Amino acid sequence: TFAMFAAGRAYEQIRNSVAYPHFNVKICATHAGVSVGEDGGSHQCIEDLALMRVIPGMTVLCPADANEAKAATMAIADFDGPVYMRLARLATPVFEGDMVKPFVLGKANVLREGKDVAIFATGLMVNESLMAAEALAKDGIDAAVINVHTIKPIDAECVTAWAEKCGKVITVEEHSVIGGLGDAVADVLMGKVNCKFHKIGVNDQFGQSGKAADVLREYGLTADQIAATIKANI
């Protein structure tokens, strides 16, 4: 069902009847983020990663494409414990060739190497970040792109290594900048790595109705806008 209902309406049941007794329940929520489009702010869940991430013992996933969603489904079927998996409504390009990486719970995948800035992205924003990195390359900025499909437990080793290597970190998510991927990455780096850091996502506001592409642009979540924001913050 919609992430708004799975994570929002059912929150108390998930907390007390699934996570508290640590039952082996998998919650697969679709239509997440502002790319839901015309259904508007009431149905555009931009808080679900934060809500699920804070629940003790909950594993939180956000696949980047159809193949990764399939691999994640198989992985969580074999995993014993509560899991929340976030899926988008919008059609997403399917990665091919070298972009197809093994799916391992809790292990981020480096899709593009770089030395100037490390872009940590999740879900729909992984492809947008790859396109943003291509645009940045034309301006002489060598950006690494890391697909963080597992928000919790986050791959702290990968986050730390790339933050140290690049010295500049950007997080990109189709979610509130409060409590999601950006905060998960910040939690890893705080007090450990001295680097520039900026979160790209939906600021402290609700979504709104419109064509998915238009709404994504309204919140600065298209490839060209991501590239521009990165240039302004590194």
Residue locations for each model-derived region?
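Conserved thiamine diphosphate
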Residues: 1-113, 117-118
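Thiamine diphosphate
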Residues: 36-37, 88-234
